[in-house]
């Protein structure tokens, strides 16, 4: 205890002496030599305050955006059964160019503008028209002797949109935009054709946990035939998905379509879809099952009710996938279940034989039952300028849903690969063979045809 007290006393005395020395130093002005000793010259000055960064401006967002550039060159040939009018095969050499700019984000806003141009290269040996239309081809009456290849020359504003993302769960998009819903069975951009389908619309997307939803009001449909065949629209699209597990996803949808200049395609379609995937040993198994009902809307057509059933199962092992699929689109003898806004090229065969006058979408007055089998192989073969190869073979068997009549069959084959990270090449083939005979009272199926495509595509 005495030792601790002694130490405390010594510390206190030292502190007092230090204080006294400091006071004396303050009371007696030092001479210059003393000042030099007592004011060290190596004391660092305080750093200047860090300037506050200026808030980003709209100009910064525009300048910090990214260039959009796509070029797709394609050769397409069509050999269709000849008639008194259709006497020649069709060929088209076309080049599609898209050029645009997407801004960086500014206060949750992001803008995009894109132009699209489609040009023919060489002779115009093809017709542009709605299949089955009785009017002359849009590219000239003299082209009626050729099969239809719907890639008209066009230069247009493809997209002009503003997207606002107030938080991670919400996004709103207004303007001319691309709308792809699910597998594009009911709403898509028809991306296979050179002039894609876009929508003048206001759209809201919600993503909250396992729940996602999309709503869009569509004012105008910019279709694949240029402005001559666009649709004025007063349509509503609603799709909602709940995903409790990877093996099960439930989706509900309502598509209320009202087209001022296409009453035949005005309809309301609602339905449910279940899908999912899981592992069974070394195999991944995926499935889809869809039911929808379609009826007249706003009294634009006589009353009707038509059903759609669709389902598929895909098994994947290593680089191989096998899929079995069945679709049934009901027909009542006057009209069939239709999907006016779908990317229809992906369904009922790549030959597009069942694209009918009803708006140019795939349909058939007696309905279509389509049983198809697919084999997909993704070879591991890789070279510097050849990789990501993909080979797909598919077989379709078509019957009329209402009568059961044989409509025909089709083989589809596609091989594609990447040449660089931005350049790809694809070769595609479709052959539809119509049934040899039609039972009495059954609708006549479309004529036989064979199509070949060779495509180079560059995407920045």
Report residues per predicted region:
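Structural signature of outer-membrane beta-barrel domains
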Residues: 74-78, 118-122, 179-181, 218-222, ...
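Flexible, acidic glycine-rich loops studded with aromatic residues
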Residues: 360-369, 374-420, 425-429, 433-435
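Signature for the C-terminal beta-barrel architecture of outer-membrane proteins
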Residues: 28-32, 36-37, 168-172, 186, ...
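Surface-exposed loop and membrane-interface regions of Gram-negative outer-membrane beta-barrel proteins
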Residues: 76-95, 105-160, 166-168, 179-193, ...
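N-terminal periplasmic/intermembrane-space "pro-region" immediately following the signal or transit peptide
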Residues: 2-106, 318-321, 325-326, 460
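Outer-membrane beta-barrel proteins
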Residues: 57-59, 81-89, 101, 147-150, ...
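Flexible internal linker/loop segments at domain or repeat junctions
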Residues: 339-366
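Outer-membrane beta-barrel "beta-signal"
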Residues: 373, 447-460
């Amino acid at each position: 205890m005495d030792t601790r007290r002694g130490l405390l006393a010594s510390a206190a005395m030292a502190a007092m002496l230090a204080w006294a020395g400091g006071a004396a130093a303050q009371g007696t002005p030092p001479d210059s030599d003393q000042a030099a000793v007592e004011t060290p010259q190596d004391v660092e000055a305080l750093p200047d305050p860090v300037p506050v960064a200026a808030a980003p401006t709209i100009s910064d967002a525009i300048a910090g955006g990214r260039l959009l550039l796509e070029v797709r060159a394609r050769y397409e040939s069509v050999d269709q059964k000849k008639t008194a009018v259709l006497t020649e095969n069709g060929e088209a050499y076309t080049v599609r160019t898209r050029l645009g700019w997407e801004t960086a984000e500014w206060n949750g806003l992001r803008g995009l503008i894109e132009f699209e141009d489609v040009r023919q290269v060489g002779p115009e040996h093809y017709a542009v028209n709605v299949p089955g239309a009785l009017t002359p081809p849009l590219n000239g009456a003299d082209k009626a002797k050729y099969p239809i290849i719907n890639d008209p020359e066009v230069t247009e504003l493809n997209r002009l949109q503003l997207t606002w993302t107030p938080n991670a769960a919400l996004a709103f998009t207004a303007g001319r935009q691309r709308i792809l819903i699910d597998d594009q069975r009911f709403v898509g951009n028809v991306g296979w054709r050179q002039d894609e389908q876009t929508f003048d619309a206001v759209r809201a997307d919600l993503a909250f946990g396992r729940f996602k939803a999309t709503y869009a009001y569509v004012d105008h449909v910019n279709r694949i035939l240029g402005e001559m065949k666009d649709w004025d629209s007063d349509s509503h699209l609603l799709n909602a998905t709940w995903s409790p597990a990877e093996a099960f996803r439930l989706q509900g949808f309502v598509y209320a379509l009202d087209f001022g200049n296409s009453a035949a395609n005005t309809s309301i379609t609602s339905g449910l879809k279940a899908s999912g995937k899981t592992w069974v040993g070394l195999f991944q198994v995926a499935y889809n099952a869809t039911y929808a009902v379609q009826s007249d809307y706003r009294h634009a057509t006589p009353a009707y009710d038509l059903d759609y059933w669709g389902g598929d199962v895909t098994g994947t092992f290593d680089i191989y996938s096998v899929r079995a699929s069945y679709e049934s689109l009901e027909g009542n003898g006057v009209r069939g279940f239709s999907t006016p806004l779908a990317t229809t090229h992906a369904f009922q065969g790549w030959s597009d034989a069942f694209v009918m006058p009803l708006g140019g979408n795939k349909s058939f007055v007696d309905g279509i039952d389509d049983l198809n089998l697919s084999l997909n192989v993704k070879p591991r073969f890789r070279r510097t300028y050849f990789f990501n190869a993909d080979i797909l073979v598919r077989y379709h068997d078509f019957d009329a849903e209402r009568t059961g009549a044989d409509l025909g069959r089709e083989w589809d084959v596609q091989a594609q690969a990447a040449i660089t990270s931005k350049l790809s090449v694809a070769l595609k083939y479709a052959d539809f063979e119509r049934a040899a005979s039609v039972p009495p009272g059954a609708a006549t199926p479309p004529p036989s045809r064979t199509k070949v495509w060779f495509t180079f595509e560059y995407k920045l």
